[in-house]
Amino acid sequence: MAIDENKQKALAAALGQIEKQFGKGSIMRLGEDRSMDVETISTGSLSLDIALGAGGLPMGRIVEIYGPESSGKTTLTLQVIAAAQREGKTCAFIDAEHALDPVYARKLGVDIDNLLCSQPDTGEQALEICDALARSGAVDVIVVDSVAALTPKAEIEGEIGDSHMGLAARMMSQAMRKLAGNLKQSNTLLIFINQIRMKIGVMFGNPETTTGGNALKFYASVRLDIRRIGAVKEGDNVVGSETRVKVVKNKIAAPFKQAEFQILYGEGINFYGELVDLGVKEKLIEKAGAWYSYNGEKIGQGKANATTWLKENPATAKEIEKRVRELLLSNQNATPDFAVDDSEGVAETNEDF
């Protein structure tokens, strides 16, 4: 619908004044917004990248990854860091739990010599460091491990047994308000790892909740629920975990999709095993009996041998990955924010843990 000429002039003057006062790009028509196409970083799992709909985790946004103990939360974030570093990005790890294992991180492909690491004394210090790194515009990925370990200064200086109701929730709420805009401006991805707690006295519905209040749930563009669903065995030896990740909230594509993959001890996500499964599913890799073939060439008898062949032939693996991404990501459209619902995820609570 055409706008009146006088209104057009008034609008142009107003836009000019806003840009003069707040800088170029402070207001623009949505169709002209250069950030409409969200840049993403791979999670290290092809099936999870596809479940996310955009091909990975979105830059300039807040992401929450939560789950029970030993479910693979830290492993997943280290795989994201490794993928980002391979693209030449700078990453930081805020180790509030003081439990980061550099030897394990190196095994997962992380360049620990170029990984920024901080072990803050208080929750406020950790969040201020995040904000300073984001405002610098020089850091691309920040991981905070974990929200539950972000202890307010007042609690650290107080006695054990003192009541500090809602302190952590208030601290997180204030930090989210401050961080969201800075992350968007600097196009920095901020990943929070979170733990699960049980609400007492819940008779119906999900008794699980996450720590740190409600602010993180609202500000996060993506929330991932990660669970260990079984063991990977070689004979009688357990060599890894079968893992399921559910996309509980997604502001960049359709939510509630799931991905299942293996996390192998000392190796991380079994990417090439996923590639074989998805290649067969999309008919890019032919399977006849126990034999796997690609473009008429046999690549292995049994999944383990086919996986090993792809590891040894990275150019072919990259070609198959590219074709799988084109097939499975091309038809996925973004959904509006109002279509996103946390109802099937972790229950909301006003309590602070």
From Swiss-Prot:
<keyword id="KW-0238">DNA-binding</keyword>
<dbReference type="InterPro" id="IPR020587">
    <property type="entry name" value="RecA_monomer-monomer_interface"/>
</dbReference>
<dbReference type="GO" id="GO:0009432">
    <property type="term" value="P:SOS response"/>
</dbReference>
<dbReference type="GO" id="GO:0016887">
    <property type="term" value="F:ATP hydrolysis activity"/>
</dbReference>
<keyword id="KW-0963">Cytoplasm</keyword>
<dbReference type="Pfam" id="PF21096">
    <property type="entry name" value="RecA_C"/>
</dbReference>
<dbReference type="GO" id="GO:0005737">
    <property type="term" value="C:cytoplasm"/>
</dbReference>
<keyword id="KW-0742">SOS response</keyword>
<comment type="similarity">
    <text>Belongs to the RecA family.</text>
</comment>
<keyword id="KW-0227">DNA damage</keyword>
<dbReference type="InterPro" id="IPR023400">
    <property type="entry name" value="RecA_C_sf"/>
</dbReference>
<dbReference type="GO" id="GO:0006310">
    <property type="term" value="P:DNA recombination"/>
</dbReference>
<dbReference type="InterPro" id="IPR049261">
    <property type="entry name" value="RecA-like_C"/>
</dbReference>
<protein>
    <recommendedName>
        <fullName>Protein RecA</fullName>
    </recommendedName>
</protein>
<comment type="function">
    <text>Can catalyze the hydrolysis of ATP in the presence of single-stranded DNA, the ATP-dependent uptake of single-stranded DNA by duplex DNA, and the ATP-dependent hybridization of homologous single-stranded DNAs. It interacts with LexA causing its activation and leading to its autocatalytic cleavage.</text>
</comment>
<dbReference type="GO" id="GO:0006281">
    <property type="term" value="P:DNA repair"/>
</dbReference>
<keyword id="KW-0234">DNA repair</keyword>
<dbReference type="GO" id="GO:1903911">
    <property type="term" value="P:positive regulation of receptor clustering"/>
</dbReference>
<dbReference type="GO" id="GO:0050918">
    <property type="term" value="P:positive chemotaxis"/>
</dbReference>
<dbReference type="InterPro" id="IPR013765">
    <property type="entry name" value="DNA_recomb/repair_RecA"/>
</dbReference>
<keyword id="KW-0233">DNA recombination</keyword>
<dbReference type="Pfam" id="PF00154">
    <property type="entry name" value="RecA"/>
</dbReference>
<keyword id="KW-0067">ATP-binding</keyword>
<dbReference type="GO" id="GO:0140664">
    <property type="term" value="F:ATP-dependent DNA damage sensor activity"/>
</dbReference>
<dbReference type="InterPro" id="IPR027417">
    <property type="entry name" value="P-loop_NTPase"/>
</dbReference>
<dbReference type="InterPro" id="IPR049428">
    <property type="entry name" value="RecA-like_N"/>
</dbReference>
<dbReference type="InterPro" id="IPR003593">
    <property type="entry name" value="AAA+_ATPase"/>
</dbReference>
<keyword id="KW-0547">Nucleotide-binding</keyword>
<feature type="binding site">
    <location>
        <begin position="67"/>
        <end position="74"/>
    </location>
    <ligand>
        <name>ATP</name>
    </ligand>
</feature>
<dbReference type="GO" id="GO:1902021">
    <property type="term" value="P:regulation of bacterial-type flagellum-dependent cell motility"/>
</dbReference>
<dbReference type="InterPro" id="IPR020588">
    <property type="entry name" value="RecA_ATP-bd"/>
</dbReference>
<dbReference type="GO" id="GO:0003684">
    <property type="term" value="F:damaged DNA binding"/>
</dbReference>
<dbReference type="InterPro" id="IPR020584">
    <property type="entry name" value="DNA_recomb/repair_RecA_CS"/>
</dbReference>
<dbReference type="GO" id="GO:0005524">
    <property type="term" value="F:ATP binding"/>
</dbReference>
<dbReference type="GO" id="GO:0003697">
    <property type="term" value="F:single-stranded DNA binding"/>
</dbReference>
